[in-house]
UniProtKB/Swiss-Prot annotation:
Pfam families the record matches: SepRS_C, tRNA-synt_2d
Top class in the EC scheme: ligase
Annotated GO biological process: translation; tRNA aminoacylation
Amino acids binding substrate: 186-188, 231-233, 273-274, 317
NCBIfam families: sepS
Gene Ontology MF annotations: ATP binding; phosphoserine-tRNA(Cys) ligase activity; tRNA binding
Catalytic activity line of the entry: tRNA(Cys) + O-phospho-L-serine + ATP = O-phospho-L-seryl-tRNA(Cys) + AMP + diphosphate
Protein name per the record: O-phosphoserine--tRNA(Cys) ligase
Keywords: Aminoacyl-tRNA synthetase, ATP-binding, Ligase, Nucleotide-binding, Protein biosynthesis
Length: 537
């Protein structure tokens, strides 16, 4: 907390002095907590759900009402809608199946098996029979069976499960039996049911839409087909409705997603639930992608199918695959990777990788941490001293009643050199997935590397960590360790940097894995010629 009154008094006496001196009150974050190692974290929506919401709003803007169509459809409805074609259509449907409920009796043999487990049945026989009978009749849910058996016999649930496994093996041998119910393979099967029920409840014409999941038994999933997908479908019912309504709706809907110019081409499939010569494929031009794309299908339902549902007016239906539109909007090449990104490789951008490059060792004590900045400034200021030369920094630290006098001596004894090597001011950048050390100046850099390094500096992400910064933190971290362990002296020598660890840096395993898998590089090589002796008294 600031001492506000003292600051105001200081400012009243000498504003300029107060303005400069109070800057020290704003404490800088420690290196591993500073930018770019801290980065904003945003929630992320899924492209399919984004597209669903955009489609919902697009339909609503066009005056449609939203409905949820049945997901479970009886196969009889498929026959009513498709006629003779139904058998071929049902091949792509998933049927719902369930386990039958076995007629399990409580024979003398079963009672004997239970009693061999050390459980007396005689007093509880009637209760146990009622439970087994209730399960067979469907009045008792399967997931309650073990609990009810345990309660009836006054035993633990673990023992109840053992009885179910060992005495009633019939439950383990059950095989699912298919019903006549299917999972909706396309939205049309639900529209017939919905429109039929609304005919006497809503004034004509009416416009409905539904965006929901469908299930299709594909032979295999590939980059453009999944066994479950979302259909964004609409239906318009009323006198005078025809394929012109389909064309207008297609244009109105898809123009909201950046498409311009539309082609309407007769669909060769000719599904029997559509009136002949009305089933139409919609191709739209996307100026950003500069190509024509098939994006929707529409048609007018056949009077034959409509009549079976008590519908006596034309109904136009248009549908499009949400995943298809999301792939176009997001420029995805594989629907599987778009829908299930968690099962595919996650690519980190340069900004993300830069946030994962951190100092390995950092002093904990504030006094020693603060010494690091002084050390860095002195090294930068004196880096070009001609050898033989040395730079000495002395500090006294107080820890309660104990004082420690520290003498740090940075030196170069060999003649004809500088105090520190030419790479000492190199800074770590992340560029095109690579982690590289880039010099402050490109003087003397070989032409074959110069263009890459220049691009790295102008287009890459700077970590704001120089070699000298990281090395000085390594030095003060060792100093802190020496003070704590009562070590009187130590040396640090780093002649040539070959890896991140040589300059006290580390990188997150996630980033490292990507760098290796993408054949990217970590190249921080360079001469720093750091020689240090530290004495503590």
């Amino acid at each position: 907390m600031f001492k506000r009154e003292e600051i105001i008094e200081m400012a009243n006496k000498d504003f300029e002095k107060a303005w400069i001196e109070t800057k020290d009150l704003i404490k800088a974050k420690k290196v591993n907590e500073s930018y770019p190692r801290i980065k904003p974290v945003f929630g992320k929506t899924h492209p399919v759900n984004d597209t669903i919401e955009n489609l919902r709003q697009a339909y609503l803007r066009m005056g449609f009402e939203e409905y949820i169509n049945p997901v479970i459809v009886d196969e009889r409805d498929i026959y009513k809608q498709f006629g003779p074609e139904a058998m071929a259509v049902l091949d792509r449907c998933f049927y719902l199946a369930g386990l039958p409920r076995p007629d399990v009796g409580l024979s003398d043999e079963k009672i004997s098996q239970i009693e061999k487990l050390g459980i007396k049945v005689s007093e509880h026989k009637e209760s146990l029979q009622k439970i087994l009978h209730g399960y067979k009749k469907g009045t008792l849910d399967g997931d309650d069976l073990v609990l009810e058996i345990s309660n009836a016999l006054e035993i633990s649930s673990e023992m109840g499960l053992k009885i179910l496994e060992e005495v009633f093996p019939e439950f383990k041998d059950l095989t699912a039996v298919s019903s006549k119910l299917t999972l909706r393979s396309h939205m049309t099967s639900g529209w017939f049911l919905t429109v039929s029920d609304l005919m006497n409840k809503k004034p004509l014409p009416f416009k409905l839409f539904s965006i929901d999941r469908c299930f299709r038994r594909e032979q295999k999933e590939d980059k453009s087909h999944l066994m479950t997908y979302h259909s964004a479908s609409c239906a318009i019912a009323g006198e005078g409705v025809d394929i012109n309504d389909g064309k207008a709706i297609a244009e109105g809907l898809l123009s909201q997603f950046g498409f311009t110019n539309f082609k309407f081409i007769p669909d060769e499939k000719k599904s029997k639930y559509y009136t002949p010569e009305t089933q139409t494929e919609v191709y739209a031009y996307h100026p950003k992608l500069k190509e024509w794309l098939e994006v929707a299908t529409f048609g007018v339902y056949s009077p034959v199918a409509l009549s079976k549902y008590g519908i006596d007016v034309p109904v136009m239906n248009l549908g499009l695959g949400v995943e298809r539109l999301a792939m176009i909007s997001g420029n995805f090449a594989d629907v599987r990777e778009m829908v299930y990104p968690q099962f595919y490789e996650h690519k980190l951008d340069d900004r993300a990788v830069a946030s994962m490059v951190k100092l390995d060792k950092v002093p904990v004590m504030d006094e020693i941490y603060d010494l690091t900045k002084e050390l860095i400034d002195s090294c930068v200021k004196n880096k070009d001293l001609k050898s033989p030369c040395e730079l000495t920094i002395e500090k006294t630290f107080s820890f309660g009643k104990t004082k420690k006098n520290v003498k740090i001596n940075i030196f170069e004894k060999e003649e004809g050199k500088n105090l520190l090597g030419p790479s000492i001011l190199n800074e770590i950048y992340v560029y095109d997935g690579n982690v590289i050390g880039i010099p402050e100046s490109f003087d003397g850099v070989k032409e074959e590397f110069k263009e890459f390094l220049e691009k790295g500096k102008s287009e890459g992400v700077a970590t704001s960590i120089r070699y000298i910064d990281a090395l000085c933190f390594k030095l003060t971290s060792k100093l802190e360790e020496a003070i704590v362990t009562n070590t009187s002296e130590f040396k640090v020598k780093v002649p040539i940097v070959r890896s991140l660890s040589d300059i006290n840096l580390k990188i997150d395993d996630i980033a490292l894995k990507q760098i290796m898998s993408k054949n990217k590089v970590i190249d921080v090589r360079g001469p720093v010629f750091l020689n240090v002796e530290v004495k503590i008294e």
